From Swiss-Prot:
Claim: Chloroplast is one of the keywords in the record: no
Residue spans of biased composition, Basic and acidic residues class: 22-31, 560-572, 621-632
Signal peptide: none
Species name: Macaca fascicularis (Crab-eating macaque)
Coiled-coil stretches noted in the UniProt entry, renumbered to this chain: 148-259, 305-336, 420-440
Entries under InterPro entries matching the protein: Lebercilin-like, Lebercilin_dom
Name the UniProt record assigns to this protein: Lebercilin-like protein
Length: 668
């Protein structure tokens, strides 16, 4: 059995014995109260003994608080509670025993007397009480020993805690001391940081003072060294003089004093002369250096001026070269069209006027815009002529012109100043500038003359128009309306051509025109006055206009050409709705006039005079170009198509006195 079971059995036995004792005591008290008092006294004595023992056992712990009474009270309360719980069980057991004792008595011990039973029960009761008391003493002793053990452990823990507290206090003191030291060090460091600028200033002042002392000491050393050198030199000089004097004193073959003084005077005079020469030479050196510096400055200025002049000349040469290149390009462009013009002229002279096919007419239609562009470029490129009221009617043989110009330009460029002599350069430049100014003046005078002549012609034309009758003016207005209609038709034609495309083949261009129905051309008959007005000529004829008979011939020729072109178009089946074509033979003299005007613009009037003198025999055929020029009025300009199919004559606008009388006519 285990210890727990043993303890349970012992406790049960104790409680059962206690219950029996209580029952018996109650019975004995009823029977004999004396014995009850004795038992009470004995129990009280036992209790007192127990308390005395507990006090004796705890006497050694008088210094500390005694917890035995409280512990016993707690144990007694627990025991009483247990007794109250187990009283009914004990009563039932006692009843069973009593019944068993009765049965045994009834069977075998009927002879035993009541006194023996009482003594026997008393001895048993005493023995049980003694056992219970011993057991109580053992339990109390164990509990008290455990309590003492616990108290000792707590005392030991208290002592350990006291030791730990003392150690912690000592550590805290040490840490406080360290903190104070650290605070002092931090305060010193902060103070040192605050005092840093003061310390630095003190240090700098000390360094400055030390440097000043060093300088003073060095200066003193230098002065002392100079004094030493001076003294050394004086000593050497004195030694030399002493040696010389000793030698003189030792010499016995010396001359007389007069001779020596004479020699001294001669030597001194020579020395003075030498000094003067040296001074004069120094002055001459200074003067020569100044003169040389001046000459150098002058030469440098001259070189700078020459360099600037060379730079300007180089820039001018570059500009001239660029202009020459541009003019070469222009001449190349012009030469292309001049060759084409010549080819077209040869073609017109070779084979007769035959009605052109529809494909050729389509080609003429397909490229009107390129011809007009080329005409614009030719008009912009050709310079204005200085001759009286004459304009260029075509561009011919420009290759020969360009070659001659290219031959003459290097000749003029070679005349430019070279970089060898500055004086010649400046003189040449001044001459060239004068020459250019003269050329500009000549050109201005020629232009002014041309302007005056144009103004006079305009005034004459205005006067003649004012003298016209009102009937002729009424005839002009419907013609102006017809010209406006022609312009509108031409603009529509241009738009249609732009839509169809300029790069299409001639067959494609001819297709839309062949489909449409052919339109008969209308024939108009105008008076001479209206025809003259169409061509920009004065309308009035007769004696007042006797000088303008040339223009009447040109109008008749123009009308005949127009009728021939109408017949050609009627044969070919193609009738353009506007314009008229005219072919003009250009002679070689026009080229000469153009060349002379171009050379005059490029190189001045003097060069043109030289060329005129060199070629006097060319003036024979000058009448033919005049006739060709008279065929065109001064307000017209002719140009050929790029492919020579047709020729365009553009009539410039004439501005009369009233703005409504202005007129513009474009003929293809």
């Amino acid at each position: 059995m285990s210890l727990a079971d043993l303890t349970k059995t012992n406790v049960d036995e104790q409680f059962s014995s206690v219950a029996l004792e209580n029952n018996r005591r109650s019975a004995e008290c009823k029977r004999s109260p004396g014995t009850g008092d004795f038992s009470r006294n004995s129990s009280a004595s036992a209790k007192s003994v127990d308390y005395s023992r507990s006090q004796c056992s705890c006497g050694s712990l008088s210094s500390q608080y005694d917890y035995s009474e409280d512990f016993l009270c707690d144990c007694s309360e627990k025991a009483i509670n247990r007794n109250y719980l187990k009283q009914p069980v004990v009563k039932e057991k006692e009843k069973k025993k009593y019944n068993v004792s009765k049965i045994s008595q009834s069977k075998g011990q009927k002879e035993i007397s009541v006194e023996k039973k009482h003594t026997w029960n008393a001895s048993l009761f005493n023995s049980q009480i003694h056992m219970i008391a011993q057991r109580r003493d053992a339990m109390a002793h164990r509990i008290l020993s455990a309590r003492l053990h616990k108290i000792k452990g707590l005392k030991n823990e208290l002592a350990d805690m006291h030791h730990k507290l003392e150690a912690i206090l000592t550590e805290n003191q040490f840490l406080k001391q360290l903190q104070l030291r650290h605070l002092k060090a931090i305060g010193k460091y902060e103070n040192s940081q605050n005092n840093l600028p003061q310390i630095m200033a003190k240090h700098q002042n000390e360094v400055k003072n030390l440097r000043q002392l060093l300088r003073k000491s060095q200066e003193k050393e230098r002065t002392v060294s100079r004094k030493l050198r001076e003294t050394d030199s004086q000593l050497l000089k004195t030694k030399d003089t002493l040696q010389a004097l000793q030698k003189l004193s030792e010499d016995k073959n010396l001359a007389e004093r007069e001779e020596l003084t004479h020699k001294l005077s001669i030597i001194t005079t020579k020395m003075e002369a030498n000094d003067k020469k040296i001074q004069s030479l120094e002055k001459q050196l200074r003067l020569n250096s100044r003169v040389f510096s001046r000459q150098l400055a002058i030469e440098t200025r001259k070189t700078l001026a020459a360099q600037t002049a060379t730079k300007t000349l180089q820039v001018e040469v570059k500009h001239l070269q660029q202009k020459l290149k541009e003019k070469d390009r222009e001449l190349e462009i012009k030469n292309i069209y001049s060759h084409r013009i010549l080819k077209n002229l040869h073609d017109t002279e070779d084979y007769p006027k035959v009605s052109s096919t529809k494909s050729v007419q389509a080609d003429r239609k397909s490229l009107p815009f390129t011809s007009m562009r080329h005409q614009g470029t030719q008009k912009s490129d050709v310079p204005p002529l200085t001759t009286k009221g004459k304009k260029a009617t075509g561009n011919m043989n420009h290759k020969e012109k360009s070659t001659e110009i290219n031959r003459e330009i290097p000749h003029c460029v070679n005349k430019l100043p070279k970089q060898e002599d500055s004086k010649t350069k400046y003189e040449d430049l001044s001459r060239e500038e004068k020459h250019l100014e003269v050329q500009v003046l000549l050109e201005n005078t020629g232009r002014q003359k041309d302007k005056k002549e144009d103004q006079e012609k305009k005034t004459i034309f205005v006067k003649e128009e004012q003298e016209l009758p009102p009937k002729i003016i009424e005839v002009i207005h419907p013609e102006r309306e017809s010209t406006q209609e022609d312009v509108l038709v031409r603009e529509k034609f241009k738009r249609s051509m732009q839509r169809n495309g300029m790069d299409d083949t001639p067959d494609k261009c001819t297709a839309p025109y062949t489909k449409g129905p052919l339109r008969q051309r209308r024939h108009y008959s105008f008076t001479e006055a209206t025809e003259n007005l169409h061509h920009g000529l004065p309308a009035s004829g007769g004696p007042a206009n006797a000088g303008n008979t040339k223009y009447s011939h040109s109008t008749s020729k123009h009308l005949s050409n127009r009728e021939e072109m109408e017949l050609e178009h009627s044969d070919s089946g193609y009738e353009p709705s506007f314009g008229k074509s005219s072919r003009i033979k250009v002679k070689d003299t026009t080229f000469r006039d153009k060349k002379s005007s171009l050379m005059e613009e490029l190189f001045g009037s003097g060069y043109v005079l030289k060329t005129d003198q060199s070629s006097p025999g060319v003036a024979k055929g000058s009448e033919e170009p005049l006739q060709s020029k008279e065929s065109h009025p001064p307000s017209q300009a002719s140009a050929s198509n790029a492919f020579g199919d047709s020729k365009v004559t553009v009539v410039n606008s004439i501005k009369p006195s009233s703005p409504t009388e202005g007129k513009r006519k474009i003929i293809i």
